[in-house]
């Protein structure tokens, strides 16, 4: 494929050849653990929904879909109009595709069966946060979609589908996110590395722009809502102080950046190196991020990119989920910083990470 697909001449430094997301999936299908046509179509369905969601976000002000819808979700959070649109479009795309038997969404109280016959012959279950950081849409800031894919074992039926789908994140067969920002990126893993695709609006295709992503181990940034600092544990406060201390030998200081959209903060830290934190607090002892469709997919992805994800005491991907909307503390990003956070939270402090 060449620049003939794009509008106008290619700028200096542009990619000389590109691969679409669909071509990439077909080309590498033999390397995927679930290398079937149904699995490939499932990923295509998610990408189609992402394009529709992106279209609505880009035109939200014109279409009058900014602001709240007047309803609340199961989390007792006020829903944005775009929350409902994104949720609907993902469910529609997966229902039309016919490869998915079960979906679980942040916006729905319970899982939804997509199996038309109720026999669950379709083997994939998909969990998603349809529009992470949706409060940012009214101020034209970045938002995202997160998704997680599992296979259901033979013999699962509608009665026990959720029970058998609630499995540790280490058993995911695919996970990823879509970042809707200055450009729109689709980033995913199937357990064989991480690849990022940028949407070319001229041709309506996701093109491979970030192959074989690896998170830098030298951290550049940390992300946390420090407005909650009075609710943090003494160990976490000590860790934050350590993070802010300039390296006496190099003069390097880790900078703070926090957008308020998990996808956006994570995406930046994936590219630059860093740590995202949403800890347990006195008000939220179990944390706030949801395990099945926020922490698990991002943990699977970051480990494939050479990073680490933890509650501060346990690997995220080892957690056994107890419910669709279960919450967890999360420390995710460059492995050295996650390990440092674990050391502080476990009472080993500065000595374990080489001092402040």
From Swiss-Prot:
One Gene Ontology biological process: fructose 1,6-bisphosphate metabolic process
User: Which cofactors?
Assistant: Mg(2+)
Question: Which keywords does this chain's UniProt record carry?
Answer: Carbohydrate metabolism, Cytoplasm, Hydrolase, Magnesium, Metal-binding
Residue positions binding Mg(2+) 1: 106, 129, 131
List the EC numbers from the record. 3.1.3.11
Recorded hits in SUPFAM superfamilies, A to Z, give: Carbohydrate phosphatase (SSF56655)
Into which EC class is this enzyme placed? hydrolase
What's the catalysed reaction? Answer: beta-D-fructose 1,6-bisphosphate + H2O = beta-D-fructose 6-phosphate + phosphate
Q: Please give the pathway this protein is involved in.
A: Carbohydrate biosynthesis; gluconeogenesis
Concerning its family, UniProt says: Belongs to the FBPase class 1 family.
Name this protein carries in UniProt: Fructose-1,6-bisphosphatase class 1 1
Q: Which gene encodes it?
A: fbp1
């Amino acid at each position: 494929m060449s620049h003939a697909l794009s509008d106008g001449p290619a700028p200096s430094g542009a990619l000389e050849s590109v691969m679409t997301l669909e071509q990439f999936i077909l080309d590498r299908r033999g390397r995927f653990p679930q290398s079937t046509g149904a699995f490939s179509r499932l990923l295509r369905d998610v990408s189609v929904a992402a394009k529709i969601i992106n279209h609505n976000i880009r035109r939200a002000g014109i279409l009058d879909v900014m602001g709240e819808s007047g309803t609340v979700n199961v989390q007792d959070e006020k829903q944005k109009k775009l929350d409902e649109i994104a949720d609907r479009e993902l469910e529609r795309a997966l229902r039309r595709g016919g490869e998915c038997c079960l979906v679980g969404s942040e916006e729905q109280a319970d899982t939804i069966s997509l199996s038309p016959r109720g026999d669950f012959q379709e083997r994939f279950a998909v969990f998603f946060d349809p529009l992470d950081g949706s409060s940012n849409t009214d101020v034209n800031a970045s938002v995202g979609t997160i998704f997680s894919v599992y296979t259901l074992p033979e013999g699962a039926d509608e009665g026990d589908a959720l029970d058998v789908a609630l499995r540790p994140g280490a058993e995911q067969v695919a996970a990823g996110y879509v970042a809707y920002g200055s450009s729109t990126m689709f980033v995913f893993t199937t357990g064989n590395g991480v690849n990022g695709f940028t949407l070319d609006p001229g041709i309506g295709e996701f093109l491979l722009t970030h192959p074989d992503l690896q998170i830098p181990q030298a951290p550049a940034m940390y992300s946390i809502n420090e407005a909650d600092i009075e609710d943090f544990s003494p160990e976490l406060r000590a860790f934050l102080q350590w993070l802010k201390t300039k390296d006496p030998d190099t003069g390097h200081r880790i900078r703070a950046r926090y957008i308020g959209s998990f996808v956006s903060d994570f995406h930046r830290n994936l590219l630059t190196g860093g740590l995202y934190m949403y800890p347990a607090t006195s008000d939220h002892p179990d944390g706030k991020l949801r395990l099945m469709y926020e922490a698990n997919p991002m943990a699977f992805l970051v480990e494939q990119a050479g990073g680490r994800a933890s509650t501060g005491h346990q690997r995220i991907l080892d957690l056994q989920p107890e419910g669709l909307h279960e919450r967890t503390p999360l420390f995710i990003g460059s492995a050295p910083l996650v390990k440092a956070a674990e050391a502080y939270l476990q009472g080993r402090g500065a000595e374990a990470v080489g001092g402040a």
